[in-house]
């Protein structure tokens, strides 16, 4: 069995990764977030209780599991403490089991102001950002202008770096976007006060994870967003600002690639997307409405309605390739219950020419017309089914067809939001 597993979304995010992380964590000792920030939205349902996590790893709901926020994550301390406060009635020891890399870049107030100002200025061409400062924080990291968690514990160093960064960003806010500048002293005092609360959680995540591995612990790497939102491999420029693919797990945690283990690709039984960007299989008819309503397709972070469409096997195959996916997990199968016909995009037609590979970039994808293969639906309910043999024959055929198109084995099927509404086809851990 594999010692570690990487959980990756293979679509545009919202694939149901949080539930699967929570379910698999029963067999793990640590969970690691390695990219993104509090723009993620992982919804977990346990019994009658629903918990939505944005920054803290989903393994926090399992007792005795250590949770890590790796160096690849951009950290908003205010959002972190807010989430911890919300968790406290349910997970009173969350702060004691959470560890944060000292190398995490900080999201500061000017990042949020810039994010919102930039999005508003783009008008109809806007990307659909969450407005939480994620993109500007990553820009500062690449520009080597970022303030990191470690800087919080050195007042003079933090103040000097803040002054330099703020001088630049306030100029942009005032003279380009015509916005009010951010206040240096207010930011300095507010964030230095947060340092005491952060201090017990700050560690060298790479070293801690290496020690856990040496002790035989199983580590789960929790991806946020999805492959098609990857800054390099996604539908650029309608992407997030980090590497959401499996390779990001190594760079964003300090664990070597050879130690990542099994790569589990999570995909919905249909396709959704939040925000702008091309979406070849998007539905604008009553079936699209059916999927949105039955699937409760509203973003956990933004509250925006998700766009819905048929399953795209071309995109899945590309995601499996760039992630090195070992096995597939298909979620929300129960949403398709009752449809007479289900379609899967198996290729694209571009200017009359058939192609079977996902094109790079948004412009090329926008020109693609999907070529569909049809499958019979099923009238029986799959909600809550926990054994493969209990699924309708048509549902099994549909799932097997997806796996065949992806050239990957079926590992897990999710048939509902509860952690136990799950079918295991292949042992992972």
Curated annotation (Swiss-Prot):
A GO cellular component entry from the record: cytoplasm
Domain of life: Bacteria
EC number(s) reported in the record: 6.3.4.4
Chain residues that bind GTP: 13-19, 41-43, 306, 332-334, 414-416
SMART domains according to UniProt: Adenylsucc_synt
Cofactor note: Binds 1 Mg(2+) ion per subunit.
Binding site for IMP: 14-17, 39-42, 130, 144, 225, 240, 304
GO biological process per UniProt: 'de novo' AMP biosynthetic process; IMP metabolic process
UniProt cofactor(s): Mg(2+)
Subunit structure: Homodimer.
Physiological role: Plays an important role in the de novo pathway of purine nucleotide biosynthesis. Catalyzes the first committed step in the biosynthesis of AMP from IMP.
Similarity comment: family membership: Belongs to the adenylosuccinate synthetase family.
Name of the featured protein: Adenylosuccinate synthetase
Species assigned in the record: Acidithiobacillus ferrooxidans
Gene (name only): purA
